[in-house]
Amino acid sequence: MRGFAAILERFLAVTTTLYVGMGAFAQWVTAPVTAPGVQYQTFQSAAAGQTVSFHVWLPSEYTSQPARVFPLLIWLHGSGDGTSGIPWLSAYFSTAMAQGVIPPMIILFPNGMPYSMWCDSRDGRVPMERVVIDDLLPFVDANYRTIGGRHRILEGFSMGGQGAGRLGFRRTDLFAGLSMLGAGPLQDDFLEAPLGSDISPVKRAMIYQNVWGNDAAYYTLQHPKTVITQQAAAVIGRRTVVRQALGSLDTLVPMNQDFDAFLTSLGVPHTLTVAPGIGHSASDLLPALGFGQWAFYNAALAEACRPLTDVDGSGVVDAGDVSLLLLDFGMTGSPADVDADGAVTGSDLAMLLLDFGTACDA
């Protein structure tokens, strides 16, 4: 009987979505947020076919050093209200920059709507990934003094943490670091709610319909596990700096530990930090990670500066890199797989020789 009841519960939850519209999901323009250093902007998105809003925070050096270019930190918000955290987050990172523990960065706060999961919806009505990657990032690069290249860190919390994983793994050419904070959903079946979840079955079913079209195959296709399985060689080869972090009281701990083990099984370098006594809250988690957490941002930006052909990480492309490449010739999962095609080949050697003598590209 329990099995039948579970099936019935799922059926009723899914069919409920037939009576729920897209109203809460399709909000391309938010109200402005007022906070020191924060700007509210809109742009025309080709993917969305309409105006889309975003917020951006600029460091004081953006005005005082008008010739300077800056790395970009992209923060992907969690589900629900995507703008309420902007004042706290901008102040938090501003303080760290003022203290000199991380370099000045531009912070981009995209509008991910309440429940987009930062994913292109199955029916095409909410092409969230394309809006962010294909439209918003080029717009920001064209209108703000960003360094470009891989001088970007992709970070997010909850829904945004899951999105940071999927988008960051998929586009290793755009991001040198990705940070999955309190990330979810990471379960293999979205309709299997984690213990303690505060998302009702009806809302969960509504999200499943509107984002993944009630299509288990599409959910799996867009799952970070699927993406990193396809992209492991590129993530490893490009030395993308990957971290997971969440609180010990977060209901998403088991699925994040499972994802940690999955990354380990693929040989993907990463870290997992579980902060004692912290629940599902970005404003509690980030301070709880302590001073040492700033090493993640600095490592990612240092990696962005390193030419991909600097295989040994010495800071310059030299004979040591040639030696390592030749030793790994034909191997998979090697940092010497510069073009991330899955193996160390002659094309990697050609790229290295073209870059011989090159140092940091910033």
Where would I find each of the regions flagged by the language model?
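Non-catalytic cap/lid and distal C-terminal segments of serine-dependent acyl enzymes
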Residues: A26-C305
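Conserved beta-strand positions that form and line the central face of beta-propeller blades
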Residues: T42, D310, D337
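N-terminal secretory signal peptides that target proteins for export/translocation
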Residues: M1-L8
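Alpha-helical segments with a strong preference for the paired helices of cellulosomal dockerin domains
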Residues: V311-G333, D341-D361
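Bacterial N-terminal signal peptides
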Residues: E9-G23
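Low-complexity, Pro/Thr/Ser/Gly/Ala-rich linker/spacer regions in secreted
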Residues: G23-Q27, N298-D310, S334, A359-A362
